[in-house]
């Protein structure tokens, strides 16, 4: 695999359905020994996760990393708060953006890049119910169009 490309481990599809993503930021994760082993095995769940900025530092909450099977007594707490590694400018930008009401930080993807676990954090605004329905209708229409084009080519 060429340097710079990441191997996708987990994706938060629910976040793209529930939120409209305004901007994304790549952040590193501070992990314990058995956590990275579990992540490499793909045993991570981003579904209920979110990020917050506290005292000038970014933290990731409610991301479940399953205990490593061979970890015995050295295993970690699956739902512990994990620190995100960001530059000060990025943190200040996120602080300014999240002061707006209705804007939150959600994890979108976790991947391994150059041997390090990275998380793609999305600056997100919650969708209303009618927005979700509209998106589903649009996807269904696109699917039908692609199906008819595919059938016409045959």
Curated annotation (Swiss-Prot):
Chief subcellular location: cytoplasm
Protein name, as recorded: SsrA-binding protein
Function comment: Required for rescue of stalled ribosomes mediated by trans-translation. Binds to transfer-messenger RNA (tmRNA), required for stable association of tmRNA with ribosomes. tmRNA and SmpB together mimic tRNA shape, replacing the anticodon stem-loop with SmpB. tmRNA is encoded by the ssrA gene; the 2 termini fold to resemble tRNA(Ala) and it encodes a 'tag peptide', a short internal open reading frame. During trans-translation Ala-aminoacylated tmRNA acts like a tRNA, entering the A-site of stalled ribosomes, displacing the stalled mRNA.
UniProt GO molecular function: RNA binding
InterPro entries the UniProt entry points to: SmpB, SsrA-bd_prot, SsrA-bd_prot_CS
Subcellular location(s) per record: Cytoplasm
RNA-binding listed as a keyword: yes
Annotated GO biological process: trans-translation
Source lineage: Bacteria, Bacillati, Bacillota, Bacilli, Lactobacillales
Pfam assignment, any one: SmpB
Family designation: Belongs to the SmpB family.
GO annotations of cellular component type: cytosol
SUPFAM superfamilies: Small protein B (SmpB)
Species this chain originates from: Enterococcus faecalis (strain ATCC 700802 / V583)
Keywords of the record: Cytoplasm, RNA-binding
Superkingdom: Bacteria
């Amino acid at each position: 695999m060429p340097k710079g490309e990441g191997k996708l481990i987990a994706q938060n599809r629910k976040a793209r359905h529930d939120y409209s993503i305004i901007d994304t930021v790549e952040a590193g994760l501070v992990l314990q020994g058995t956590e990275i082993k579990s992540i490499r095995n793909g045993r991570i769940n981003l579904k209920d996760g979110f990020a917050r900025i506290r005292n000038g530092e970014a933290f990731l909450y409610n991301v479940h990393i399953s205990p490593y099977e061979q970890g015995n007594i050295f295993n970690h707490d699956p739902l512990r708060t994990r620190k995100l590694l960001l530059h000060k400018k990025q943190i200040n930008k996120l602080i300014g953006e999240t002061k707006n009401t209705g804007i939150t930080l959600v994890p979108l993807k976790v991947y391994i890049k150059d041997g390090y676990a990275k998380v793609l954090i999305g600056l997100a605004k919650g969708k209303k119910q009618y927005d979700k329905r509209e998106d589903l209708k649009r996807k269904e229409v696109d699917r039908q169009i692609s199906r008819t084009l595919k059938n016409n080519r045959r």
